């Protein structure tokens, strides 16, 4: 079976979005152009930022239709990341809370893509 290893978000400005994600992820993109930016994350996972104005074929929707999910090492890291991102001015959709699967919160990036940070409860980890 194939394994998903690449997510592309359609953004208004790849250069601005790349600066935003570089700040959040603590790493620089490996590729940038006026229409595209690429980050290579842990274990080879890739995050692409493609201009919604030049994506081919053209996309009808952008932002808010899914979530980019980032796992952290423990519940305290969920709260610390929330405090950090709040201090950076990110819009928050959900304050840190405990749900069935773990501790989590949801923020928005500049293009209204949902960013979920979570730490799974032990029973949810399998």
Set out the residue ranges of the language-model regions.
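N-terminal beta-strand motif that seeds the catalytic metal site of vicinal oxygen chelate
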Residues: 1-18, 67-70, 121-126
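Vicinal oxygen chelate
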Residues: 82-126
């Amino acid at each position: 079976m194939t394994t998903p290893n690449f997510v592309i978000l359609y953004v208004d400005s790849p250069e601005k979005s790349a600066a935003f994600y570089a700040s959040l992820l603590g790493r620089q993109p490996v590729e940038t152009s006026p229409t595209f930016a690429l980050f290579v994350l842990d274990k080879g996972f890739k995050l692409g930022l493609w201009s919604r104005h030049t994506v081919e074929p053209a996309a009808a929707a952008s932002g808010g239709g899914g979530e980019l999910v980032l796992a952290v090492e423990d519940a305290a890291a969920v709260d610390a990341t929330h405090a950090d991102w709040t201090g950076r001015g990110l819009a928050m959709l959900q304050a840190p809370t405990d749900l069935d699967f773990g501790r989590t919160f949801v923020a928005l990036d500049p293009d209204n893509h949902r960013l979920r940070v979570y730490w799974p409860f032990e029973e949810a980890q399998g």
